[in-house]
């Protein structure tokens, strides 16, 4: 039996994922446990009637499929739950990735590097100029360089003046992202975050040891195939191939 939500304060620990696929739309409801891991409370799914190769082709049909999946997920929770905010997975043939190095010069090298410094470096990546019609969806740090010292995975607390980082940047078509947002909003939901599906799949099934040793994840869906490559614990490449099990 699914675990019952004990009280209202538990709602702050609820996480909802929405997978808008070519053949089905799935809604997962999870709750963070005392170890910070996600326990699945319920799942709902519906036939995907308005999506082709990971991209929305019919707004109204996609909205109806989303509503059906969300309502089913809500009904299967042992306790009252109203889903309002979702994390949406994104894929589709419009998704691309690129590598870029960012540089952030700090005012005082003797001060410890903080999360604020890292956030400033990441924020600069979102200001990169993309091709017309494309936008940056996600910026993933790979490794950091402090005053020419390379291979640093966590620079917080270290000293240095010049902070650099190699980034894996995910881009997508503005129209495709807007259509996903529009479908979710018309279904009465709010988008908390948009997550690249190969990354979400990797976090679900790959261990830290596998990522460190080197691994390729291949997720064959109905209309697309997602690929993610890890080595030394770092995301090296992602891709969405516009062919799947039904194509």
Regions found by a protein language model. Give the residues of each.
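A cytosolic small-molecule/anion-sensing beta-strand core signal
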Residues: 231
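Nucleotide/phosphate-binding catalytic cleft detector across ATP-hydrolyzing
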Residues: 1-24, 28-217, 234-238, 245
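Short, glycine/acidic-enriched loop or turn micro-motifs at the edges of active sites
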Residues: 22, 221-224
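A structural feature that tracks compact, well-ordered secondary-structure segments
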Residues: 226-228
């Amino acid at each position: 039996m699914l675990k019952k939500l004990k009280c209202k304060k538990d709602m702050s620990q609820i996480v909802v994922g929405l997978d808008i696929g070519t053949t089905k739309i799935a809604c997962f409801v999870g709750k963070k446990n005392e170890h910070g891991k996600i326990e699945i409370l319920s799942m709902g799914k519906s036939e995907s009637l308005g999506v082709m190769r990971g991209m929305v082709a019919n707004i109204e049909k996609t909205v109806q499929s989303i509503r059906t999946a969300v309502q089913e997920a809500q009904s299967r929770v042992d306790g009252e739950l109203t889903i309002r905010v979702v994390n949406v997975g994104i894929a589709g043939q419009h998704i691309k990735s690129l590598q870029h190095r960012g540089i952030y010069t700090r005012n005082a090298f003797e001060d410890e590097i903080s999360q604020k410094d890292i956030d400033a470096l990441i924020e600069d990546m979102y200001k990169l100029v993309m091709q017309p019609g494309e936008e940056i969806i996600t910026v993933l740090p790979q490794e950091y360089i402090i005053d020419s010292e390379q291979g640093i995975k966590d620079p917080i607390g270290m000293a240095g003046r010049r902070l650099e980082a190699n980034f894996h940047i995910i881009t997508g078509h503005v129209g495709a992202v807007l259509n996903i947002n529009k479908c979710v909003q018309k279904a009465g939901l709010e988008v908390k975050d948009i997550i690249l599906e190969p990354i979400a799949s990797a976090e679900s099934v790959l261990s830290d040891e596998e990522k460190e040793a080197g691994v390729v994840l291949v997720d064959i869906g109905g209309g697309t195939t997602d690929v993610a490559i890890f080595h030394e614990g770092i995301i090296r490449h992602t891709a969405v191939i516009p062919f799947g099990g039904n194509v």
